Amino acid sequence: CVDWMQGESDEDWSGLREGMYESRMRQYQRQITSDIIARTGQNEPPIIAITQLGYVNDGHTAFTGQYARLSATKLHNHGQFRCVNTLYQYDFISDGLHLTCAGQNRRGAAVARAIIQEWFTSGWYGMVPTGFVWNSPTQIQINVPAYTNLVLDTTTINTSGLANYGFSYTDETGAPPAISSIAISSDGKGVLINLASAPTGRFGRVSYATVENALQSGATVKPSGRTLGARGCVRSSAGITWAYDTSVTLYDWLPAFRINVF
């Protein structure tokens, strides 16, 4: 397995365009697979376990930039890529880039859990959205695979300054209908996005966990993580016990994404 967490500098590169990072990762997959098999003689290619970045360039918004960060969801289950974790639910140090020691340890536990399921059970499929449906002219359902039901967690995630549990909607009009409410579907496998009115513009888009709080007084960088970073509130209803503190449960969290809904 290759434990992959990288891309902060790519996020800051003004020349990065949509699709470029994924192309480079596919090239990397070919190269690293060839190198590892040549050295180990193993029969199966290694899994590339991607942890989605928590860092967001301060100039990026819900629907602009973040191409390296969002590549984790686009690459998931293509070839050897698996999106196994996201970072926004953890605590970061003051530079807004790096996890605390506890956060890094919890990240490692999440990666290990995904790899064990990939190799020794029915495989890891994570919580990357698989599609959407319009249940009505004002309700979008985002379908999310999960081992357990989905829940909205407003305890782990600080909701001060966070609208709609992390979800955003836009279209070509420049004045899209507002999101009126967010809920979990009755079967626990989808997120219901309710709009205040039916959209009149084309190219509707939904994003999740892509908006940070404003720069805090006295700070020089925007933070990452569960308190002020680009984050959301959707997680699994069950998880695993953290080995270093059995009172802590480590859940699966919905990774940041954008999806075109018409």
Regions found by a protein language model. Name each.
Residues 1-262:
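Cell-envelope and extracellular/periplasmic
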